[in-house]
């Protein structure tokens, strides 16, 4: 809500808008237990058509480059060397996707499907929720909880998301004119995501810059290629670089209502406490690769571990009095004052 009524009830804080959260209250004296669960198989709704043929990709790249600059490039995106001899060899090759040139460096002539290397075809998710409620005329309670888990979309050793949340709500009538309500909730989330050798760059950007189909993921001797390290496939498949995100939220609200004069004068008060804790652990490792059988190299320059912690506490209270005098059937008046 963001209008005059929210400002009237919530004062200065109401000017920034008020979010009203309504949760279920147990009805009647029946004790109820309810379970709900599901299992899902998920896949991407939109999958781009990728050019995975190295020669076709190179032809299109050359056409674009020549139309822009009027001459042939000396490299493709500054890491992949280009010359006419390599281009003619790319046309000739089909079965053997790499060779060692006179300088002892690998040259690649691949048709790599980077989309399949980076993304899973489908992922699985499941959720389970439980609700217990009951009570009597003077006291009612509701306890609910939910667990949700989903695998990530990356073709990685560890890529997943887990969430736990719960709520306990109690309503009690201490006297006919005095009611108390407590609402406690929490949410705990954990996300484990793979990282490349440098977590400052998105996988999609690295893929666009270095993941062209002529590149290979591994060399003939099984070592990683420079492209596999740059794009992040090496990090995903070895699980040596990752980011672990944790977030916990807890909210406690206690409210009291006093009917000083039934249907005429009512006093309400509430107190809310909110606590949030966030943690992030990021680990980035050095990856070895080979530019040739006898040309080992690595990225990045060093291993790193970054840990961040955030804590937030928030408290708010409200007290307001509502006067609704009886003015007959044709007239009404409502006066509200609060702090």
Where are these regions (language model features)?
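A beta-strand signature from Gram-negative outer-membrane beta-barrel systems
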Residues: 1-34, 125-127, 140, 146
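A generic structural signal for short coil/turn motifs at secondary-structure boundaries
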Residues: 7-9, 118, 152-156
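Residue-level signature of outer-membrane beta-barrel architecture
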Residues: 23-25, 134-136, 172-173, 256-260, ...
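N-terminal entry motif of extracellular EGF-like repeats
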Residues: 113-115
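Outer-membrane beta-barrel initiation region
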Residues: 120-122, 132-135
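Short coil-to-beta-strand
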Residues: 137-143, 291
């Amino acid at each position: 809500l963001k209008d005059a009524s929210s400002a009237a009830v919530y004062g200065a804080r109401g000017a920034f808008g008020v979010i009203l959260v309504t949760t279920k209250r147990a009805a009647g004296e029946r004790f109820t237990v309810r379970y709900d669960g599901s299992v899902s198989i998920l896949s991407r709704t939109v999958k781009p058509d990728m050019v995975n043929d190295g020669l076709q990709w190179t032809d299109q790249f050359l056409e674009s480059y020549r139309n822009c600059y009027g001459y042939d490039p000396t490299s493709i995106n500054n890491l992949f060397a280009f010359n006419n001899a390599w281009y003619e060899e790319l046309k000739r090759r089909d079965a053997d996707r790499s060779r060692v040139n006179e300088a002892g460096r690998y040259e690649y002539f691949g048709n790599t499907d980077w989309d399949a290397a980076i993304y899973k075809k489908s992922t699985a998710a499941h959720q389970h929720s439980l609700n217990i409620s009951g009570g009597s005329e003077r006291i009612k309670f509701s306890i609910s909880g939910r667990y949700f888990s989903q695998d990530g979309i990356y073709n990685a050793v560890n890529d997943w998301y887990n969430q736990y949340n719960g709520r306990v709500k109690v309503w009690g009538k201490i006297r006919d004119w005095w009611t108390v309500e407590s609402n406690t909730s929490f949410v705990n989330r954990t996300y484990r995501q793979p990282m490349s050798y440098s977590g400052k760059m998105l996988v999609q950007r690295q893929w666009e810059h270095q993941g062209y189909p002529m590149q290979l993921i591994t060399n003939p001797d099984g070592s990683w290629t420079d492209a596999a390290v740059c794009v992040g496939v090496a990090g995903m498949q070895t699980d040596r670089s990752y980011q672990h995100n944790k977030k916990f939220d807890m909210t406690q609200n206690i409210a009291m209502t006093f009917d000083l004069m039934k249907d005429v004068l009512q006093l309400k008060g509430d107190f809310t406490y909110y606590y949030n804790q966030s943690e992030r652990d990021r680990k980035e490792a050095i990856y070895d690769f080979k530019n040739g059988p006898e040309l080992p190299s690595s990225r990045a320059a060093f291993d790193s571990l970054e840990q961040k912690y955030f804590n937030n506490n928030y408290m708010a209270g409200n007290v307001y009095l509502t006067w609704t005098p009886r003015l007959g059937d044709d007239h009404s008046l409502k006066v509200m004052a609060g702090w």
